[in-house]
Amino acid sequence: YTNPELTTSEPYVMGSHATCSGAWVSGPEDIAPDDYFWGYNRMMSVEGLFGAGDTVGGSAHKFSSGSFTEGRLAAKAAVKYIEDKKANNIKVSENQYNNLKEVIYKPLENYTVGRNEITGGTVSPSYISPIQGLQRLQKIMDEYCGGITNNYMTNDNLLKKGLELLDWLQEDLENVGAEDYHQLMRAWELKHRALTSQCVTEHTLFREETRWPGYY
């Protein structure tokens, strides 16, 4: 046994947190100017779509504490949106419900089938675990999209390579496996993080004039 070597850093969720990117959302009613408030806190310019954390612009430093706090604010506003009956026109058929249910629980099925093909430890050619996918996502975002490995800097070529690797990861996430409901939650967290990572990377690629390294 040897003592682990640590590189202490901020508690960021993904290596891309130091970017000037993100979607435009409504501010809180009590302090936001009229131009920055359109009905519900953290609602994007798309009606009924709420965002928080790395998906939202306005601040480059979306650390863990700020992200989950903003997520709580967005969730409360989304509940109020529903309570105000703004979502009443949304109709969901029984067929849509069943299809969505099948998609949500698919990681459990992936594991049930793939566990019989495990070649060693938790390695299976048929599925990847949420932690395996998360480590892969972290490596992509850290090395190509402005993480600590590159001193929070990136460029056109790195971002394009990062998007290519994220596309490959999305293909593999169709086969993410979950052995229980906790892992099912982790699987969907991973899918949402991967989608957020793609959005942030595409946005950073577009904003050539503000593709800046963090911590100026």
Give the predicted meaning of each segment.
Residues Y1-S16, S64, F68:
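An anion/pyrophosphate-binding glycine-rich loop and adjacent beta-alpha core
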Residues A18, W24, D30-Y216:
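Glycine- and aromatic-enriched mobile tails/lids
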